Amino acid sequence: MNEPEKIDPRELSPLALAFVGDSVLELLVRTRLARHHRMSAGKLNVEKVKYVSARAQFREEQLLEPLFTEDELAVFKRGRNASKASVAKHASPEEYRASTGFECLLGWLYLNGQLDRVHELFDTLWQQFDPNETR
């Protein structure tokens, strides 16, 4: 993942940060799956959904929250508390809000140029999924 175009994340709404963060997580998961699993695109997509659904992101955030810095926790809470008109079909409102907060944090880190931190959190998370796989 390359350095993003410089955008001041403070100028974006929490939901705009979550929009970016959703793409960051999606790209990381897709890349890791494609690199380590030789299967059809359809099967890769089935696997991907296990990691990028609102329910999965809720569990991921719960695993990582103890590692968040004070600033990261504030950004997560800002995203979690953002007003939502809709919720995911297969997730509770709590899960959906937490997943939005997690996406907001990833978008904020990415747009702040903190790619090492994005990878650090993702690698920690991925070790929970499959301890035998590395970046």
PLM regions: where:
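Double-stranded RNA-binding/processing signature
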Residues: 1-135
